[in-house]
Amino acid sequence: MDKTVSSPEQAVAGIGNGAVLMIGGFGGSGAPVELVHALVDRYVATGSPTDLTVVNNNAGNGRVGIAAMIDAGMVVRMVCSFPRSSDPRAFTEKYLASEIDLELVPQGTLAERIRAAGAGIPAFYTPTSYGTELAEGKPVAEFDGKKYVQERWLQADVAIIKAELADAHGNLTYRHAARNFSPLMCMAAGVSIVQARKVVAPGDIDPEHVVTPGIFVDAVLEVPEPLQEEELVRSGEAYR
């Protein structure tokens, strides 16, 4: 099955109001900027999608990517580990104005909650956060004399990620740190949308090099020269 699409707009066209989105990227590394900005374009033009929940390692940086979504008013809730990046102005402004909610999750717990969803595990126990505000209201159990906090899986309607290579069937490879949470997000989401630097024919990727099998991918867009979020932030650029 050919999963390629011809434009960022086509790729994100099915994302609706109130969706939970997992967006790949660790800081700016591996951020799918073109897909995210296509989603902002659609919101600016139509007012949709809105009331989004975004799951990412951080809450955006500068005025691009996730920060552009927050700036536009599309996002009502962030689930992340680091809400304060090197330039957190977009999230900070909305949060102080009570226009966005935050669920703060320790980074290892965030990754494991996403992984658990992909593996079909509804809950697990971790010692992380026990005795802190982050554990308030959560079940606690004792194993071998040590207290553990119960955490629930973290599912999403859509994952939006960036890959290095993809074939038309959706099999993916990644480049270095750009891999980050992306493989887990593809497994935890109902629909996965991918931008890849290069799309090749089925069979051109060595099966031993495939990180995300195509069964977890629904749409693939080739972006030969992707924008680098960190470069945009350092240069002070903003979403259009």
What label would you give each PLM region?
Residues 1-240:
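Conserved alpha/beta enzyme-core scaffold
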